[in-house]
């Protein structure tokens, strides 16, 4: 293939050049994995997008990071799998059908077409031959196979359960999908309902999922901690309390003469001042049948949401019953029994005792209902007579006080002593205490009352009951002829689709109308990418080659949703026999967001495209372009359509090119932190693109005829040392995801190279050879981040192959011994940046390097240098 390059005399035109190189990559199928490849495997994957309509800058940053890793690893000699697909089921498509009268399938595939084109504009090194959408029949067919496999292994259950019901979306939500008591998509206040639901038995893997976190050394500690807390293993005691009635509850006491509480702090029993039961506890239900006020209280609690997250933020509320609980260590102490909104029935036993002195939730409750607060843990070094609990509970360590036989013990010692005493005491013929382990993790409810999801392959027969769809009858396809003229699930109104013969008895039966939670779709897609053409859900040979994913990239918001479900699915697939490994993702990187200033006027939010910003008297001012009216500059926040602080990637690519966008989103801050989008930052990246091209333009006539070689003496040797050090440090930065540091080093090295390239015609042959090697290194290192520019420059210098097909350069360890120094550069006494020069550089060499810096040049647009103060190996101050 003949590779043409730009006329070296022209300004670099990113749009034309980028399209050219993308076409060449596509034609040669550079990034497509074939079975003939036999090098070491490396699987890099970014969380695939929901096809909402257009990509945003968060997508750009996420996928650019993954692409840098993919291109770097490919150059390092790996066979790299870097696929792309679409997380395509979900409520937004149905909402669009309701609002715009567009079928969800049409809406989804139209959006995919647009977003695919946008992603291709970025020059991502993706294997598009493996592309699929989770709404493709071929994909959800295999997902239904997996459901049947899980069903056969006993990992699927159908049971009536209280569920989180979103009254707007009219569907069930998992606990993780309820945020502050509201639906994560609709924002509606979640209600509690009892429905027959399908569950995946993720709780069977609680211990294994917890233990597996210790092996995930390449995961952020924060994510591992979040999952550990969500799984929520605790070691505690089941404590049985005798019940007494004050009045009106004698019948309840006959049926329930005791209540069992679960506690991780039996050491604090002498500080207990109340018991609290869940609104769903059998005792609560029995009392409510005879007490209308209690019944109303329970209904009110349910309307506020009953998830852990909702209850943590809700005001603590209780209803005092006529029951009293007898203290297990002192029968003369009787504690009031409350029905409380903060106790969950599905954790522990649905009953707790409250120790207000040493627990914030209990203190809040006791403070509201004027209950006693008795401290039983004394901080070390404190005086028991003076110690009181005032505004906040004491939750630290210490020694036990006011606790009878536990006094003087540490809380840990008191736990054991209390447990032993309770295990030896009897109540109604059984020990009053029993050690147990509890997990917070609950089974995953996957039933959703909506159309646009994977149909659950189940048939309901009046004679045979619940019957799985035979594997040979799959897929159960979604019907296209549905209506969206009202909320709810259209499948429930589609009698023709529902009607089916029972595969066991042949009688008329009905299909399951619930579809699967969309998190099921994303829980195994990474495995399907290894062989998306396989007839079974996965190809075992491909799985063995590629899994686990070496590097997974996505947002930390998925720590206890997608990431935990994917870990469960991997274990379930191992149990079925599809895979041999436990974990889906060996390495995980969670990137920060792209954020932007917000702007407002009297009419509301204003977009960045509608304003101009000037600096006046040291302050930035914003005005509307249309009428020059003043606009208030607000906080820097996550880009969102609602606040209009979004920047369309298409517009930026059209103006500056994809390489500029890729370079900027990685250059401005560490990748795990948020990056602030600024027009000046993008313009700076664009200037760098043009500067690189100018350097190539000036040097190409000479360098294209030069064979690269390491310098052996003088300035040529110093340049080679700098080039090899750059190669070593940038390689280390890329391995550590320190993309911003790598970019900073590339800026610095161009500052070293540029003055020499400007006088290329007059330098000695040894320097020319050293410069050619340095330029080759430089282009190889910018290629993962700015692939189009690197290809164009490589071709301009006479390259006969694609730079993306070249191996990563190798540095000489003998040349990376540190003999450079980095000097802070001040302008009028204020630090503006740094310059790296040889430790032995003369003042003239330092001055030349400083004058070549972009930020120095920017300050010289309207001003001139009065003097430059250089303290060798210390500092440079430019006085304007």
From Swiss-Prot:
Q: Where is this motif: 'KMSKS' region?
A: 638-642
Pfam family for this entry, one: tRNA-synt_1_2
Q: Where's the motif 'HIGH' region?
A: 49-59
- What's in the GO CC field? cytosol
Report residues binding ATP: 641
> Any S-S bridges, and between which cysteines?
none
Q: Which GO terms describe its molecular function?
A: aminoacyl-tRNA deacylase activity; ATP binding; leucine-tRNA ligase activity
Keywords tagged on the record: Aminoacyl-tRNA synthetase, ATP-binding, Cytoplasm, Ligase, Nucleotide-binding, Protein biosynthesis
Classification via Gene3D superfamilies: 2.20.28.290, 3.10.20.590, HUPs, Isoleucyl-tRNA Synthetase, Domain 1, Valyl/Leucyl/Isoleucyl-tRNA synthetase, editing domain
**TM stretches of this protein:** none
Q: Which SUPFAM superfamilies match?
A: Anticodon-binding domain of a subclass of class I aminoacyl-tRNA synthetases, Nucleotidylyl transferase, ValRS/IleRS/LeuRS editing domain
Q: What is its EC number?
A: 6.1.1.4
InterPro entries reported for this sequence: aa-tRNA-synth_I_CS, aa-tRNA-synth_Ia, Leu-tRNA-ligase, Leu_tRNA-synth_edit, M/V/L/I-tRNA-synth_anticd-bd, Methionyl/Leucyl_tRNA_Synth, Rossmann-like_a/b/a_fold, tRNAsynth_Ia_anticodon-bd
The protein's annotated catalytic reaction(s) are: tRNA(Leu) + L-leucine + ATP = L-leucyl-tRNA(Leu) + AMP + diphosphate
Query: Where does this one sit in the cell?
Result: Cytoplasm
GO terms of biological process kind:
leucyl-tRNA aminoacylation
**CDD domains cross-referenced by the UniProt entry:** Anticodon_Ia_Leu_BEm (cd07958), LeuRS_core (cd00812)
What does the similarity note say?
Belongs to the class-I aminoacyl-tRNA synthetase family.
Name the HAMAP family for this protein.
Answer: Leu_tRNA_synth_B (MF_00049_B)
The record's listing under PANTHER family reads: LEUCINE--TRNA LIGASE, MITOCHONDRIAL (PTHR43740:SF2), LEUCYL-TRNA SYNTHETASE (PTHR43740)
* Name this polypeptide is given: Leucine--tRNA ligase
Species this protein is from: Bartonella quintana (strain Toulouse)
Q: Which gene encodes it?
A: leuS
